[in-house]
Structures are given as C-alpha cells and as structure tokens.
Amino acid sequence: MSDQERGSENNNRSRSRSRSPVRRRMSDDHGYERDNHLSRRSGNYNGRRKFADTYRGSRDRGEYRGGRERSDYRERERFNNRDNPRSRDRYDDRRRGRDVTGRYGNRRDDYPRSFRSRHNTRDDSRRGGFGSSGARGDYGPLLARELDSTYEEKVNRNYSNSIFVGNLTYDSTPEDLTEFFSQIGKVVRADIITSRGHHRGMGTVEFTNSDDVDRAIRQYDGAFFMDRKIFVRQDNPPPSNNIKERKALDRGELRHNRKTHEVIVKNLPASVNWQALKDIFKECGNVAHADVELDGDGVSTGSGTVSFYDIKDLHRAIEKYNGYSIEGNVLDVKSKESVHNHSDGDDVDIPMDDSPVNEEARKFTENVVGGGERNRLIYCSNLPFSTAKSDLYDLFETIGKVNNAELRYDSKGAPTGIAVVEYDNVDDADVCIERLNNYNYGGCDLDISYAKRL
C-alpha cells in the first residue's frame, strides 16, 4: 500500500470515528492521533494543550509528548464522572490551567490567594453554638438575603407583644421560629437578628397579644429548639438613639420623666420568678417593671419589687396582696416611692451621689478598662446613653448567667456609654465576645472585650 493510499485510509477512519455516535475505546487504532473528545468537552477544554497532547509512541505504553502525568484510566474516569461533585474534587483543578471557566466563573482568579489552601479544612462557623475555634468575634454565616429583613422592619413592631430568643443555632430561620412558636398562638412576624447580614444566634417573635408572650416565656424559656437550649425573654425596644435626648442626658437633664410607684414584696416562694411576680400584680393595674432578687447561686432570696405607673394601682396592690398567702408563704407588701426615668417601658435609674447602690456601681466599674486577659469580666463601650441597668441584664443574660452588671457614669452623673459585666463562668464571657462584639444595639456598634482592673 502506497503512502498516499495509507493517508487516505487514515483520514477516512478518523472521519468515521468522529461521526460515530458510539465512543470508541482509547486502546483501539494504535498509531493514530489521540481522540481529543475529552478536551473538546465544555469545562474540560484547555486551548493551550489542545494539540500538544498527542502520542509519540504506542498508545498502550502511555508515552506522551505533552507531558501529562495522569493515566488514560483516570482521564476516562474524570470524563465519565464529570457531573459528580465528589469525583471532580478528586482531581487537582490547577492542572486545567488558569483559563478554565467553571460554573461560577474562573475558579482560580475569582478569589484571592489567601482563600486557597493546599489542604481542605472544615468550616465550623455554620455549626452555631460557640462557632469556630478561630479568632474571637467571628460571626455566624451570612443569612440569605430573602430571609433577612431591614433594620427598620425589625424595630418597627409591637414590643409588648414580642419575645427575644437567644442561643439559636446559626442555621435557624424566621420560618423555623414561626413554626415553633405558633404552638403558643398566632405569630405576626419572626426575625433573625443579624450584624451586617451575619446570623448572630438571636431572634425575635411577635404575637398578636401579650398573653401569648407570657405563655411563651413560661413554656419555652430553657426549652430545646433545634437541639439547643434557648433563652426566651420579654422583648424590649432598643434604647433611643435620638440626638436631642442624648444631648439632654449629657447635660444631666432628664426629659420626659415618668414617675413610677414601687412596692417591695418580701417572703416570696422560691418558685416565683420575675415573670410570675409580674403576672400576679398585673391584676392590680399596669405594671411598669417587676424583679426578683437573686443570690450568688441564682436562687431567689424571697424579695422582689413591682413598679406601677398609677399610685392607685400601688394602693390596690398593697391592699390585695399584703398578707396574701402563696404556696404557704404570707407576703409582706409595702410601698417604696422611687422615681425612674421611664422611656418606652424600660426603667432607667437616675444616678445620685448619695445613693449606696450607685456607690457600689462606682466601685464595681472604677479603674476598669478593656483589653484584658481571658476572664469572667466583660468591658462594653459605645452603648447608647439611654441604656438602663435592666437593659444590660436583658442583653447579656441571653448568653448566660450574669452575676453583676453596672453602667459607668461620669463625675456629674451623666452616662458614658460604658458598662462592666461579670459572668458566672468564663465560657459565657467567651461566647459574649464572640456573639456581641460589633453587635448593633440601638444604632450603636458595641465594642466588647475582656476587662481588667488597673
């Protein structure tokens, strides 16, 4: 057979192979140019190697002129399993070249080099809980845009009908909260609290009435939601971020003061917490605030306070509950006049130089700064000036048990936006920094770190 006839036969065989709907084996037709159907596939194409990957010798011996390091078997396996993500990951994408365009763009050039690693590492940030073991202040994962609401939408709700839910898993959604708390009553809306779009492990749920709020707190505070123990509290509006009010507070002027009337309740059963105390005295009128004093172990001391807006409600409470028996304990209810700056349902204690309570607060916050070593004490700055002590407990007890929390005031009694918080254990302090550092509270990004005394 002449060279011309042999060349014609080779061309016919090549055309026949390319037109055939059945893929031929690579081991067939020794001596001919390699079938490049793999390189022509979308996603596996590399123009710079299109013609360089031909055989120099026997196809069976796998002798390449293009210098490819993988066997024919692996090339065939990559082609046959091109739609299997696990199979794709077995092969190093770097061998495809920098001009390979994947499903979401160039896989090597779209991301900075610092994000690429020679070894795969597990991302624990989506697991919720304590988050990853990386640097402090790590956020949860980004919440899907369609699941997140704007800040204005989140704060524009009826706070008296809302609850605050803490210690959520990072994969929880507003729909999960709605489904879970619908067992209590009709849910108007549910939101996940975020910081710059990142899940912070906290949320809010709004009901149609305040009775559902009380039931939700009694039934689900300390319950398990998505395999995590959650905290459920009465939701409070963020402290006012009004500039005029801030300036008034800077000058020591207290505007819109609303006088409340307080009763002291003694000999309470240990089973009565602040929510139960509030429920009891709500029968006498509009309760502004209720609290039960706890000892160092978090156990009730049997003493509590209830504040009313109307003096008539106070007299009604004394008349009804003084000498009243609860679980065998006879209550002792007396009046104690107290003036509070009350804004939107939250008590703000007025600092007074001769107050022994504020003297203790000064001693607790005196010479305390941030940037300390790991310990139970937390230093928080950049708080809204209208933040109350009760706000501190509402915020920081979403993480764990708080032994003490105090606001710092300047020499004139004006707020400084600084607070010192002591947790019961150092693990809660760790989580507090991780979850609440840079958290937007009342329009202010909080700066939280371990505290130290000078």
UniProtKB/Swiss-Prot annotation:
Disruption phenotype: Sensitive to boron and hydrogen peroxide. Decreases cell population growth. It comes from the Eukaryota. GO terms for molecular function: chromatin binding; mRNA binding; RNA binding. Residues 1-141 are annotated as: Disordered. Present with 1990 molecules/cell in log phase SD medium. GO terms for biological process: nuclear mRNA surveillance; poly(A)+ mRNA export from nucleus. Its main location: cytoplasm. Binds to intron-containing transcripts and is involved in quality control for the export of spliced mRNAs from the nucleus. Binds to pre-mRNAs until splicing is completed or until faulty mRNAs are degraded. On correctly spliced mRNAs, GBP2 and HRB1 recruit MEX67 to allow nuclear export. On faulty mRNAs, GBP2 and HRB1 associate with the TRAMP complex that guides those pre-mRNAs to the exosome for degradation. InterPro entries: Nucleotide-bd_a/b_plait_sf, RBD_domain_sf, RRM_dom, RRT5_SRSF_SR. It comes from Saccharomyces cerevisiae (strain ATCC 204508 / S288c). The keyword RNA-binding applies. The modification Omega-N-methylarginine is found at R127. This is Serine/arginine (SR)-type shuttling mRNA binding protein HRB1. Residues 161-237, 261-338, 376-453 form the RRM domain. The modification Phosphoserine is found at S338, S343, S355. It is found in: Cytoplasm; Nucleus; Cytoplasm, P-body; Cytoplasm, Stress granule. GO terms for cellular component: cytoplasm; cytoplasmic stress granule; nucleus; P-body; ribonucleoprotein complex. Residues 14-24 have a biased composition (Basic residues). Keywords: Cytoplasm, Methylation, Nucleus, Phosphoprotein, Repeat, RNA-binding. The keyword Ubl conjugation does not apply. The lineage of its organism: Eukaryota, Fungi, Dikarya, Ascomycota, Saccharomycotina. Methylated by HMT1. The gene is HRB1. Residues 25-38, 50-113 have a biased composition (Basic and acidic residues).
